[in-house]
Amino acid sequence: MKKNNFIIMMASYVATIGVALAAEYFVSPTGNDEADGSVGRPWRTIQRAASAAIAGDVVTIRAGIYREWVKPANAGRADAPIVYRAEPGEKVVITGSDPITEWSRRSDGLWEKNIPYDTFGGLNPFTDFIQGAWFSPKGRNHFRTRLIQNGEPLELHGEDIYGKMTNGIPKIATGHAALIPGVVSGTIYAAFKSDPNVVVPELVVRPACFYALKTRRDYIVLRNIVFRNAGPQWGHPRGEQAGIVGSNWSRGWIIEDCEVSGSSCAGITLGKCANDFDAFWTDRKQSFGLWGKRLFERDLSEVGHHIVRRCRISDCGQAGICGAYGAAFSLVEDCEISYCHWKKPFEGAEMAGIKFHAPVDSIIRRNRIHHNGSLGGIWIDWMGQGTCIQDNVLWANQGHDIYLEVNHGPILFEGNDMLSKNSVWFRSNNVAIIGNRIYGNFTCDRDEDNGSRKTPTLYPHSMKIKELFVSTLPGNFIFINNLMPNKPYFGKSIEYPCRFEDNWYVPRDYWKIDDVKGTVAVNPPAGSKKPVFKRVDKERLGKTVLLDQEFPECSGSIAGEL
């Protein structure tokens, strides 16, 4: 016993010493990577600090623009994360773009610039294109780069411009540019709106701003940093999911008070790493049986547990936040996510403001999600088991505000405003819809081949597979205390009975939506009968079909409180 007590005492002592020895490193645009990183002798690059920082250390970054891809070398611990933060009160920008200077003016009015390939930082703007499983290019190549002048990207052309060239020179309109590859260099021909030698444009030359090359770089905090302009590859759920910022199969990241924008594909990724058995940027029809079995043989409980809060995420080609399996047990709150996949230059199956696979026991709450593209606001795909979507405002999305694809639940929608033309698309079962204001249309249908698609179920509150192939036929939707234009009709799509209790149906003519501010006012017609709303608890919701699992804890919302 005395020996055990001594071991415990020494372990506590060592842990205390480790925290006490934690360092604070400083980075400044005027620093020097040969310095010691102290407050008086800061480093020049964030990467220099990221190579040195270990558990418990803090990296304080002074105001400026940092043109680098930061690759964290080490992991923190749950009780001693590695913190990367802007100096309080100062603006720090990490960008994947570089200024392009010394343009030549041609006699035809175009601007020309030849750039050697060996000047780029991990992304070749002339030859690297978006590609991958579940990606539809719409008949043309799409560059991972961007050419930006005065904050506005130009429309880029590659092979599609070859038929419009005279003597090797493209014909392009103002606001467009052509990227013509060579052997060791490439040439840009651009029709800028302003003189590029006065208003200097920037070209995206890096695939990320802060992304770990190695997995399990756990417990990292990013605080009050602006990340913009990078060219990650398409992030599909059976391969590596890279973003402007990405955890790469790690645990316990906190990304707070940050801005993320200008991604070719994803903004923030909390998802999968690359494996030799992945469908990595290849055809989508790889057998799920082998892939799924090998994926879930890993200890998936080691990843996830992330927090993304108070962030502004915008202008991402694919998704604002995405995460396949690595976003389990995570929290996304108080964020604004907008204009992701808004211009829709390509299509695919991974586009939304938030796109998660297997967000087990994850919470998405108090976010403002608007003006997003084809699949809309929030897309939960597979194993949304114990997922809570609470107190969000979704509006002006081109697709549905919320899309549930082949989940078995339980999933809780509570206290949300869903104000787009199309509010909800159900291809799942076991969903509790409590105390929401739902303006748009409902869609409920069976997945491909009349709902024959089967997906895994998990043991409650874990990432351990219970059954690999379980029916996803829709049903057991529980509507209580909602304000809606009408009672949804699901027809023959439903396999399991649904419940409608104490909902208030007010026709759309009496709703006023502000698509700029994301607000709603509802003025029911005279004589409209408001039901007596009653509090909702887990006992009232009951358990799920198929899984016999309780729904997540509900705050008991009623529509009259929204």
Regions found by a protein language model. Give the residues of each.
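Positively charged n-region of N-terminal signal peptides that target proteins for export
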Residues: 1-5
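Short amphipathic alpha-helical "recognition" segments used for binding
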Residues: 6-7, 519
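Bacterial N-terminal signal peptides
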Residues: 9-18
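Boundary at the C-terminal end of the N-terminal hydrophobic targeting segment
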Residues: 20-23
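Extracellular polysaccharide-degrading/modifying enzymes targeting complex plant/algal/animal polysaccharides
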Residues: 26-249, 259-262, 269-298, 527-562
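Glycine- and acidic/polar-rich repeat regions and solenoidal domains
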Residues: 210, 232-248, 264-544, 548-550
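Mature catalytic domains of secreted/periplasmic carbohydrate-active enzymes
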Residues: 253-254
